[in-house]
Curated annotation (Swiss-Prot):
This is Patatin group D-2. Tuber. GO terms for molecular function: monoacylglycerol lipase activity; nutrient reservoir activity; phospholipase activity. Patatin have a dual role as a somatic storage protein and as an enzyme involved in host resistance. A motif (GXGXXG) lies at residues 36-41. GO terms for cellular component: vacuole. Residues 361-385 form a coiled coil. Belongs to the patatin family. The keyword Magnesium does not apply. Residues 1-23 form the signal peptide. GO terms for biological process: defense response; lipid catabolic process. Its EC number is 3.1.1.-.
Amino acid sequence: MATTKSFLILIVMILATTSSTFASLEEMVTVLSIDGGGIKGIIPGTILEFLEGQLQKMDNNADARLADYFDVIGGTSTGGLLTSMITTPNENNRPFAAANEIVPFFFEHGPHIFNSSTGQFFGPKYDGKYLMQVLQENLGETRVHQALTEVAISSFDIKTNKPVIFTKSDLAKSPELDAKMYDICYSTAAAPTYFPPHYFTTNTINGDKYEFNLVDGAVATVADPALLSISVATRLAEKDPAFASIRSLNYKKMLLLSLGTGTTSEFDKTYTAEETAKWGAIQWMLVIQRMTDAASSYMTDYYLSTVFQAQNSQKNYLRVQENALTGTTTEMDDASEANMESLVQVGENLLKKPVSKDNPETYEEALKRFAKLLSDRKKLRANKASY
């Protein structure tokens, strides 16, 4: 009798724990963040293709798309382009691009985007005309409010000297942010020295014209927009009672997937103090942005890893990054077929690598684990909505 009673108590405890786990999963906010990096966007594109493929298998649904699973998708520069591709609706109100179409997009258009050199020593390296053309053709007249999930795409206004973040949740108070997606995409990709800044106008709540003079989002958020994406997710939660559990920035209630475009561990070893002691403005100008981006990306990852671990929720944060790029794969604008093939290989090889020295789990295993959480959460919400 005592054994039976103990067994029943154990069953009740298991059911209670399971129920609590699923309730917690149902309440979680899911965030996808994609770094900038020009043609190196092929690397996160390869990772996204793997993740979406796993979700399709788990849910037995070939039409499953990443926008169905993430509450917030954010990106800067090429990450902003990827964000638009997987959240902008087509005529059937589904994402106009599946994840497995991202890499082919780069192969088709990359050589043209990074081939229209202006030939001006004092001007941008590329004229940006083909980039704008392909964005208009693919994104059409779609605006921010039509995105299939919340987005967070950053840019920087060089006239007001302020960052500009395009999100759906800010449109009620700032309708001027409801810009066309192709204007936003070009702006977040308009890296100084590579592409010209972008000027366009929208309308304010009073119907007045509002001007934008924008450059690359990395100027505003550096190359890693993960913190930006989290802040948007937190503000989104403040407005939605379903996400009440994360209003105090409880990372236990957040799933964050952050995708990098690769760095090189050798970069910091390239120069010595003795060598750079005699450098002037021109020499520093050629490398300082890369140094700043690499350092800031590292610090963002370090901060997020620390705060997630402090709340005993380190499994809720996954940073997918290749830290050992070499040769032409380090370049933002080498769109030669050979280099793009190498970038695909980098992404595929990355899946087999361990997440860190302290975590033997491979990126492939970690992404499968993330996919399972995303799939289960979607099913739980669908079941709740059906009642």
